A protein has these predicted regions:
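Amphipathic/hydrophobic helical signal segments and adjacent flexible N-terminal regions
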Residues: 19-87, 167-214
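Bacterial N-terminal signal peptides
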Residues: 8-15
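Contiguous, well-ordered beta-strand patches that form the walls/edges
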Residues: 91-160, 164-166
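Surface-exposed beta-strand edges and their flanking turn/coil or helix-capping segments
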Residues: 16, 75, 128-130, 138-141, ...
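Bacterial N-terminal signal peptides that target proteins for export
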Residues: 1-7
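Short, functionally important structural connectors and interaction interfaces within domains
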Residues: 7-8, 40
Length: 214
């Protein structure tokens, strides 16, 4: 496979709007009760289905800069007011650790993923490696979708896992991405760092609205 950037193709073709469309999808098409419960981590193992990498096609941005700039403060304040278990500042510290990443932008198309770290870009074609269901002490569950880079010459993460509160084929509106080079099993133990990505077309204000209302 020739090494060419996914992003120009996505941007020129306007395909990155597919990610924005996924964002809009959650507004335009009401979720079923099962989808709502799955998003909350409540689902039966038998309802989890395989998914293709195309569910995450598009251009995505890390939300870490928005947290660092203070733009996500309304979200932290809302969480503190609603849950009462942490102050807004404690939530901010929790999410600072969770969102931490050096991958500021991701492009996905035709099973190829580009990882942008500033001016540095690494890419690889990824193969599906199944899904895993994690069970938490709270009684909630998480479905992670596993993919692997088989190109030994690539500097992209060898193992990745998507988690987006969806358990069956559906376009993602945002996602958490676990990345590493050790093994899928090692990533499954990663619970406190979950780099989070929203469509590149969304502003900080858009992301705040999405987090508060969806």
């Amino acid at each position: 496979m020739t090494a060419k950037s996914v992003l120009p193709l996505l941007l020129l073709a306007g395909l990155f709007s597919g990610a924005a469309a996924a964002h809009g999808h959650h507004h335009d098409k009401p979720q079923t009760e099962a989808q709502r419960k799955a998003a909350e981590g409540i689902f039966a193992d038998k309802d989890v289905k395989d998914r293709q990498l195309s569910d995450w096609d598009g251009v995505w941005q890390s939300v870490e800069p928005y947290l660092a700039s203070g733009e996500l403060d309304p979200v932290m304040q809302a969480k503190a007011a609603k849950n009462g278990d942490k102050t807004a500042e404690e939530y901010r510290a929790y999410y600072t650790k969770g969102y931490k990443t050096d991958v500021d932008m991701i492009g996905i198309e035709n099973n190829i993923i580009e990882f942008h770290r500033g001016d540095k870009v690494d890419q690889c074609e990824y193969q599906y490696a199944g899904y895993r269901i994690l069970n938490y002490t709270s009684g909630k569950k998480e479905a992670r979708y596993l993919f692997e880079c088989k190109d030994k010459n690539s500097h992209a993460p060898k193992y990745i896992q998507f988690s987006d509160h969806i358990i069956a084929p559906e376009k993602a509106g945002h996602f958490h991405l676990y990345m590493g080079n050790e093994s899928q099993e090692a990533l499954l133990t990663q619970l406190d760092n979950w780099p989070t990505y929203y469509p590149y077309t969304m502003s900080g204000k858009d992301i705040v609205h999405e987090m508060l209302h969806h």
